Amino acid sequence: MSRTIFCTFLKKDAEGQDFQLYPGEIGKRIYNEISKEAWSQWITKQTMLINEKKLSMMNIEDRKLLEQEMVNFLFEGQDVHIAGYTPPSK
């Protein structure tokens, strides 16, 4: 059974997460405020960041960078900027 939340990223009611996807206080906030659709958008950006910046999830500094980018993207409205990347035109 799905739950509906007000997604602070999309600024509308949307389907919420089925369970907490990320640990700690940030994870609780994501569970309560970020929809599945918004989370999917973040996962796409996260994958680009990991690949383009050659981040290693074994490296604590890389994980901290990724977490900060996630908070900026989901809660502060800042887009992820990757040097040399130009989004495809619609």
UniProtKB/Swiss-Prot annotation:
According to its record, what are the GO cellular component terms?
A: cytosol
Q: Which NCBIfam families match?
A: PRK05408.1
| Name this polypeptide is given | Probable Fe(2+)-trafficking protein
Family (UniProt): Belongs to the Fe(2+)-trafficking protein family.
A GO BP term, please? cellular response to oxidative stress
Q: What does this protein do?
A: Could be a mediator in iron transactions between iron acquisition and iron-requiring processes, such as synthesis and/or repair of Fe-S clusters in biosynthetic enzymes.
Q: Which PANTHER family match?
A: FE(2+)-TRAFFICKING PROTEIN-RELATED
Q: Which organism is it from?
A: Yersinia pestis (strain Pestoides F)
Q: Which domain of life is it from?
A: Bacteria
The keyword Acetylation appears for this protein: no
- Molecular function GO terms recorded: iron ion binding
> Which keywords fit this entry according to its UniProt record?
Iron
Q: One Pfam family of this protein, by short name?
A: Iron_traffic
Summarize subunit and interaction data from the UniProt record for this chain. Answer: Monomer.
